[in-house]
Amino acid sequence: GYFDAHRAELDELYTKIVKNLNQQAQVMGFHDYSELSYVRMNRIGYGPEDIKRFRDQVAHDVVPELQKVIALKNRRTGIQHPTFADLPVAFKDGNPKPIEGYDARMSAARTMYHELSPETAEFIDFMQDNELFDVESRPGKMSGGYMTSLPSYKAPFIFANWNNTSADVDVLTHECGHAFEGYVAERDPKIPADLECPGMESAEIHSMAMEFLTAPWHHLLFGKDTDKYEIGRA
């Protein structure tokens, strides 16, 4: 494939990037880019040694289990010698796709959050009634997804670039987790303004939790592909 044919070129390019990043860090007084990154990413309460212990634990406990999951997927897809390019392939007959159409998905999301709790019902009504989603794809639109805030309006805003894959639902529920946290925090007078947005050490708790809390409503967004989606996430 392409990557094998350009392995040497890509290795050289990667080496140049690493050297350049280290040089940038040294200009700013750091030993290397790794040391700078702890500051740049707002790491608090832990350092390189803690990360090493965590990394070793992942290698010891998580990797063997992940290898079992990947082996099951390979038997399901029939791919005998997978490369990293095959990682997204979950089923021989195609990956699960969500229901089509912005209006249909937004309607499903409103139903989902109304059934989840009164608080999330209020949240999703505010988001949709005030058009605080920019998630449809269009020419020239940047890739990725994120949640940001419009403080003057106490309004979260969600940006994404749907591409008619299961990732559309992932980004919807994930960013709604961030947005719901922001919506609640901005309305709580006990929370100072500079703490309304959590640090990077805790922000993903809200987003990942929302992905799991909305699992009972997968059928609203996937229809006949619900089982495939849930198997793929197992």
Question: Positions of the model-derived regions?
Answer:
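Cation-handling catalytic/transport regions enriched in His/Asp/Glu
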Residues: G1-R233
